[in-house]
From Swiss-Prot:
Reaction(s) the record says it catalyses: alpha-D-glucose 6-phosphate = beta-D-fructose 6-phosphate
Family from the record: Belongs to the GPI family.
GO cellular component, one term: cytosol
Role summary: Catalyzes the reversible isomerization of glucose-6-phosphate to fructose-6-phosphate.
Cited InterPro entries: G6P_Isomerase, G6P_Isomerase_C, Phosphoglucose_isomerase_CS, SIS_dom_sf, SIS_PGI_1, SIS_PGI_2
Gene: pgi
UniProt record, GO biological process: gluconeogenesis; glucose 6-phosphate metabolic process; glycolytic process
UniProt-recorded name of the protein: Glucose-6-phosphate isomerase
Length: 554
C-alpha cells in the first residue's frame, strides 16, 4: 500500500515523544565542549558519497540524537516511502500522480511501469531527440531565416522551467561550448525583455518556449513578445519554425503558435516543474554545456538516487540532512535555513532550492487533507560566499533566532587568481567555526585587555563582543563543480525535501497555493484594463486598482 494512504500524526509517535524528551536533555549541550571531549567527533559525524563530502559534526547532536532521528524515520516508514517514490506509486495524492523525476536519469535498460506502460523507452527517445537538436545547433546545421547559424538561445520559462536550468548552465559555465550563448527570460516585465533583446540578433536567435500547458501567463506573454520582436526585426511567419521550438505537453497550442510538431519536446504529468531540469526542460543546459556533459549531470543525479535507496539511514546523506532539518524546525524552533555557497558559479543555487523546498513543503495539511500538527517547511534563503559575511552573517552570529546553515564549497577553482581560492575556502571554514565556537565573556574581556582597553572600557564593551556560538551548520565539500557532482548535489536536496515531507505526512509534489494567485490575477487584470466593472473582493485590492487607473497612462 502506498505510504500516503496511511497518514500519520507524527507528533503522536513514540519516536517523536522520545525526541521531545531528548531535546530537554540537550538544552545545555555545547558543541565546543563536545569537540573538546571527543577527538573522534569529526570522524563520527562525516560521510562521503557521489563525489560529495558532508561534515555535519557542527550540529546540536550526539550519537543518541542521530539514533532517535533515525528511529523517527523508521516509525514513519521512510523505507517504504522511498520504495513508493522510485517504483512509480501514487505519491502525489491530490493530483493522483506518481513523481518520477528520478526516471529521467535512469539507464536505458531499466524498466519502470506507469499505468502498466514502461516509460523508459520514451524517456530515452526524448534524450535522443535532445541529442540530435544539440548536435545540429553546435555543428552550425540549424540555421535562421538568413541561413546564418544559431548563436544565441533564449529559454522562455518561469519557475521550474527557469530556476533549475539557469542554476546548472551558470554553475557549469567552465564547461560551456563555444559558439552558442544561452539566455533566460522569465519575468513578465518589459524591462527584462528589453535588456535581453538589446543583446540579440533575430536572424541568429532560437527561442525555447518551456511550458507544460503552453498557457503559463508569463511564459506565453514573453513568447508572444519574442515573436513580435522577431517579425519586427525582419523575420517572416513562414520562417518562424527556424526560431521557435517548444517543451510542452500541449502540442496543439504550440503548433497554433507556429512551432512545428517535430520541434516540440514532450513533458509528462509525472514530472513536476521544480524537478524537471533532468527532462527536455534541461534543453538549454545541454545546449550550454554539450550533450556528453548533460549526460554526466544525469549520471551524478542517478548515483545519488542509488545512494538514497541503498545506504543505511545512519549513513544516508539526504536522510541525515532532512532529519537535522526536522530536529531544528520542530524541536529547536528554527523558522529558516540558510544556503551559503562559497563559489561564484553556484550563486543561483539558493534560488533553485527556495523553489524546491518552499514550494514542495510549504503545506499545512497532510496527504489526506487533515491539518498538520507541527511546523513544516522552513524559509530558505542565503547567498554567495564572502558577500554574505558583510551583509547578513551578523544576524547568524549574534541575532536572537536559531538559523541552521549549509555551507557549500569546492576545493578547486576553475579560475585561480593568486591565493584567492585559499582565502575563499578559509573564509567558508572560519564562518562555520565561528558559528560553532562563538566568543565567551571571558574571551571578550581578555581580548579587550590585550588591546590596552581600560577596565571601564572592558566592562562597557565586552557584552557587545560576546558571540553565543553553538549555532549549527553543515559543510558540503566537492573537489570541483563538475557536471556529475552538481547532478548529485541537486538530487541530494531533492531527496532531502522528500524525506521531510514523509516525516510530516504532507505532499511535496503539488502547489495549490500558486494556483490561487493565478486565478485571482485574471480578475485583477480585467479590472485594471476596464473590461470588468464589478468591484474587487476586498477594499484594499480595489483601492490599489483605482490608484493605478488614476495614474497609469500606458
Amino acid at each position: 500500500m502506498a505510504y500516503y494512504r496511511t497518514p500519520h500524526d507524527v507528533t503522536a509517535l513514540p519516536a517523536w515523544q522520545a525526541l521531545n524528551d531528548h531535546r530537554k536533555a540537550m538544552q545545555d549541550f555545547s558543541m565546543r565542549e563536545a569537540f573538546n571531549a571527543d577527538p573522534q567527533r569529526f570522524t563520527q559525524f562525516t560521510l562521503s558519497s557521489c563525489g560529495l563530502f558532508l561534515d555535519y559534526s557542527k550540529n546540536l547532536i550526539n550519537a543518541q540524537t542521530r539514533d532517535l532521528l533515525v528511529g523517527l524515520a523508521n516509525e514513519v516508514d521512510l523505507k517504504g516511502a522511498i520504495k513508493s517514490l522510485f517504483e512509480g506509486e501514487i505519491v502525489n495524492a491530490s493530483e493522483n500522480r506518481p513523481a518520477l523525476h528520478t526516471a529521467l536519469r535512469r539507464p536505458v535498460g531499466d524498466k519502470l511501469l506507469v499505468n502498466g506502460v514502461n516509460v523508459m523507452p520514451d524517456v530515452h527517445k526524448v534524450l535522443n531527440q535532445i541529442t540530435d537538436l544539440v548536435g545540429r545547433i553546435h555543428d552550425g546545421l540549424w540555421r535562421g531565416y538568413t541561413e546564418k547559424p544559431i548563436t544565441d538561445v533564449v529559454n522562455i520559462g518561469i519557475g521550474g522551467s527557469f530556476l533549475g536550468p539557469e542554476l546548472v548552465s551558470e554553475a557549469l559555465l567552465s564547461y560551456a561550448q563555444k559558439g552558442v550563448r544561452c539566455h533566460y527570460l522569465a519575468n513578465i516585465d518589459g524591462s527584462e525583455f528589453h535588456e535581453l533583446t538589446m543583446k540579440l540578433r533575430a536572424e541568429t536567435t532560437l527561442f525555447i518556449v518551456s511550458s507544460k500547458s503552453f498557457n503559463t501567463l508569463e511564459t506565453l506573454k514573453n513568447a508572444q513578445a519574442a515573436r513580435a520582436w522577431y517579425l519586427a526585426q525582419g523575420g517572416s511567419e513562414a520562417e518562424l519554425y527556424r526560431h521557435f521550438i517548444a517543451v510542452s505537453s500541449n502540442n496543439a497550442a504550440a503548433v497554433a503558435f507556429g512551432i512545428r510538431e517535430e520541434n516540440i519536446f514532450p513533458m509528462w504529468d509525472w514530472v513536476g516543474g521544480r524537478y524537471s531540469l533532468w527532462s527536455a526542460i534541461g534543453l538549454p543546459i545541454a545546449l550550454a554545456i554539450g550533450m556528453s556533459n548533460f549526460k554526466e549531470l544525469l549520471s551524478g543525479a542517478y548515483s545519488m538516487d542509488q545512494h538514497f535507496q541503498s545506504a543505511p539511514f545512519e549513513q544516508n546523506m539526504p536522510v541525515l540532512l532532512a532529519l537535522l532539518g526536522v530536529w531544528y524546525g520542530n524541536f529547536w524552533g528554527a523558522q529558516s535555513h540558510a544556503i551559503l555557497p562559497y563559489d561564484h558559479y553556484l550563486r543561483n543555487i539558493t534560488k533553485h532550492l527556495q523553489q524546491l523546498d518552499m514550494e514542495s513543503n510549504g503545506k499545512s495539511v497532510r496527504q489526506d487533507g487533515t491539518p498538520v500538527s507541527t511546523d513544516t517547511g522552513p524559509v530558505i534563503w542565503g547567498g554567495v560566499g564572502c558577500n554574505g559575511q558583510h551583509a547578513y552573517h551578523q544576524l547568524l552570529h549574534q541575532g536572537t533566532q536559531l538559523i541552521p546553515a549549509d555551507f557549500i564549497v569546492p576545493i578547486v577553482s576553475f579560475n585561480p587568481v593568486s591565493d584567492h581560492h585559499q582565502w575563499l575556502y578559509a573564509n567558508c571554514l572560519s564562518q562555520s567555526q565561528a558559528l560553532m565556537l562563538g566568543k565567551t565573556r571571558a574571551e571578550a574581556e581578555x581580548e579587550l585587555r590585550d588591546k590596552g582597553a581600560s577596565e571601564e572600557e572592558v566592562q562597557k564593551l565586552a557584552s557587545h563582543k560576546v558571540i553565543p556560538g553553538n549555532r549549527p551548520s553543515n559543510t558540503l565539500v566537492v573537489e570541483r563543480i563538475s557536471p556529475r557532482r552538481l547532478g548529485a548535489l541537486v538530487a541530494l536536496y531533492e531527496h532531502k525535501v522528500f524525506v521531510q515531507s514523509v516525516v510530516w505526512g504532507i505532499n511535496a509534489f503539488d502547489q495549490w497555493g500558486v494556483e490561487l494567485g493565478k486565478e485571482l490575477g485574471k480578475g485583477v487584470y480585467n479590472r485594471l484594463v476596464g473590461s470588468e466593472e464589478s468591484l474587487a473582493e476586498d477594499a484594499s485590492t480595489q483601492g490599489l486598482i483605482n490608484y493605478f487607473r488614476g495614474r497609469h497612462r500606458g
